[in-house]
Amino acid sequence: MRGRLILIGMPASGKTTIGAALARALSVPLYDADALTEQTVGCSIPEIFAAEGEAAFRALERRTLEALCTETETPCVIATGGGAVLTEQNRELLRRSGTVFWLDRPVDNIMSTDYAAGRPLLAGGEAALRALYAVRCPLYAACAHYRVPDGTVDQMKDYILRLWRDTP
């Protein structure tokens, strides 16, 4: 097995949960970009947004992604933040640093989860989430090597593992 298995997708799409299942199945480490960013600055992402704004958070996120894509041992699983694909620089970094899987979870399914609560960019409700989805979908598609359709954690994990194992 080789390289980094990188997960992208909307906030609350299951990147960390599915990443953990993949890491267990592959017996490799999981690196959660949002958790590492929080650990680095010593406060939560909502606190960073409230105190410093989205631009400051995106700069921190970029530094975290650079570290994960250059300093982590491979193989590993990396769960990115939902906005990791917002800049061309980040998309290029992710694509050249591993195999990128887009967890394409529909808005209705994201809204139905408890873990959507407390996420700064999901605070605007369903209309805001649909607008965010419309903007980000083309960016996820441009960054991903593979699109992963929605399903249970096990279904999505197994789908990714089949693709991962078949990729040269």
Residue ranges, per PLM feature:
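NTP-dependent small-molecule kinase module
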Residues: 2, 17, 21, 25, ...
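A glycine- and Lys/Arg-enriched "phosphate-lid" helix/loop adjacent to the NTP-binding pocket
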Residues: 96-137
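ATP-dependent small-molecule kinase phosphotransfer cores
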Residues: 33-92, 139
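Conserved glycine(s) of the Walker
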Residues: 14
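Short glycine-rich anion-binding loops that position phosphate/pyrophosphate groups of nucleotides
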Residues: 81-84, 106-108, 153
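Hydrophobic anchor at the beta1->P-loop junction of P-loop NTPases
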Residues: 7
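P-loop (Walker A) phosphate-binding loop of NTP-binding proteins
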Residues: 10
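Post-Walker A helix-loop "phosphate-sensing" segment adjacent to the P-loop in P-loop NTPases
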Residues: 24-35
